[in-house]
Amino acid sequence: LAERHERPLAGVFTRWYAALRIATTGPEEAAEAAYRDAAVRLEGCGMPGLEHGLPPLALLSLRVLHRRPARTGEDADWGPYEPWARPLVLLAEGRRTAAAAALRDVPEPPRDLLSEALWCLTAPAAIAVGDRETMERAQAELSPAAAELSAGSGLLTVGPVSRHLDDLAAALHIPSSPKTS
């Protein structure tokens, strides 16, 4: 359909959405393969905001979704998402002090379709280094989206926002919010 109507980007977005669906319902390995396949379609698509940064961000989100550390030793092009990825990568490298310093420099995420995902990446880093102020900010920013899947972008997810809120509540020693459906 995309080819027939000369809309090549439709195929890019449907491939990314398919990878997202696998990430939410399938095994981690299948989701990683789907994201890597979708990333190939970004090359030269004319959308630098997606081409630079999105592929490694999707893989990092998948690892956080499965409660696994960031990959290290890779020369990832984090693009505009580098500030949110850096603390998790440093933690995976065993560099807790550097991760805490990087976390202090993390800006507020842009108020866009990836805002919740970026907060869901910030939250476990804040928990890991015991940064209460950042945990409280993440909790306040994520609370309105408690019943949602993080990142309504159709491209990636870090899982249910409620799970991240539960983790934050446990770390902050406050009661979890009641589940909404």
How does the language model describe each region?
Residues 1-181:
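Helix-coil-helix junctions within alpha-helical repeat/solenoid scaffolds
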